[in-house]
Amino acid sequence: MPNKTVLHSKHLESGAKMVDFHGWEMPINYGSQIEEHHAVRRTAGMFDVSHMTIVDVVGEQAQDYLRHLLANDVAKLKERGKALYSGMLNEEGGVVDDLIVYHFETTNYRLVVNSATRQKDMDWLNAQAEGFDVTITERPEFAMIAVQGPQAKEKAATLFSSAQNEAVAGMKPFFGVQAEDLFIATTGYTGEAGYEIMVPNEQAADFWQKLLDAGVAPCGLGARDTLRLEAGMNLYGQDMDETISPLAANMGWTITWEPAERNFVGRKALEAQKAAGTDKLVGLVLTEKGVLRHGQAVQVEGGEGIITSGTFSPTLGHSIAMARVPASVGDTAQVEMRKKWVTVNVVKPSFVRNGKSVL
C-alpha cells in the first residue's frame, strides 16, 4: 500500500489525478498542469509537500556535527531562523541528498530532506552522528504546505493570527520562524515568493481548505516540476545523485571551502575533482518545435553530454532543459531528438525568476 499524506482526501475532493511518487500517492495535477503552473507564476498556488522528511538535530555538538556532515557551513548561520541549502556528500564526493537546514541555536537545527531518499538519509544521518553529542529526531507529526506565487504571502496572511503575521513581517528569503503552532519559512521550489508552512497534522486539512477558500489554486507534482526546472532548481535523482559531484551539478556555490581545516565528509574527493576539472550543468533552450527530455544525448564542443531534466516551459512557450556536458561547451549544442540532431542554445541553468524570463 502506498503512503498517503494527511491531505489525501482533500486532493480527491478537488479532483486530483493521483500517481505513485516514490511510494507516496500524490497528485500529479487537478485537471490542468499548465493552468496550475500559470497560477503560481501569476497569482498563487499551493502544493502538498507533506511527504518531505523533517528532521530535528539537537544537542551540545549539533553545530559541530552539521559542519562535519554538510558541504555548506552552518557556522555561517548567525541569525535565529536563517536557513541554507546544502549537499550532503559521501566520501567519494557524490551527493547523498540535497537539503535545507534551519538554524535556531548552535544546539538546535531543523533539516528538510527529500522523501524519495528518506530511509537512506536517516541511516546516513545516524551513521555520521557516531561520536557526536546529538539527538536526531524525525518529525512526522507535521504536514507541510508550500504556498507560492506573487500573491501567495498576502493570501496566506488572511489565515495567520495577528501574532503569526507579526512574526513573518519583513522576513527575508530563506528564513523560518515558529509562530504559535505553525513553522513558517520563506523558502520554495518555484522561483516565486511564498512560504513553506509546517502545520500539525490534525490542523492540515482545515488549513488547506482555508487556502482554497482564499483563492489559492491546488497544484500537483507536474506543475511543481515545470516550475522548479524554469527556476533552475535541481531534482535529486535526475540532476544529481550519489555518483555525481556537486561541482558537476551547478552546486559549487553550496560548498564552503574555508576554513581549510573543516574536514567535511567528501572534502578530499571534492578537492581532487576540482583540481582535475569536472563536467558542468548548463541550461538548454530549444526555440523551435519539440520537447527536450531527460536522457537525450547532447553533443558539444569537446565531447558528449546528457539531458538531466527537460520539459516544455509554459512561461516561455518553448522547451528548456538542464544538461551535464563537458566544461568546454560553447554557446550552442546539438541534441538528438527522434533520430536527428537539433541545435539548441546553451545558457546558465536558470530560465525564469519571479514570473519573468532571465534569458
UniProtKB/Swiss-Prot annotation:
Belongs to the GcvT family. Transmembrane segments: none annotated. This is Aminomethyltransferase. It is an enzyme of class 2 (transferase). Disulfide bonds: none annotated. It catalyses: N(6)-[(R)-S(8)-aminomethyldihydrolipoyl]-L-lysyl-[protein] + (6S)-5,6,7,8-tetrahydrofolate = N(6)-[(R)-dihydrolipoyl]-L-lysyl-[protein] + (6R)-5,10-methylene-5,6,7,8-tetrahydrofolate + NH4(+). Its EC number is 2.1.2.10. One of its GO terms (cellular component) is cytosol. GO terms for molecular function: aminomethyltransferase activity; transaminase activity. The gene is gcvT.
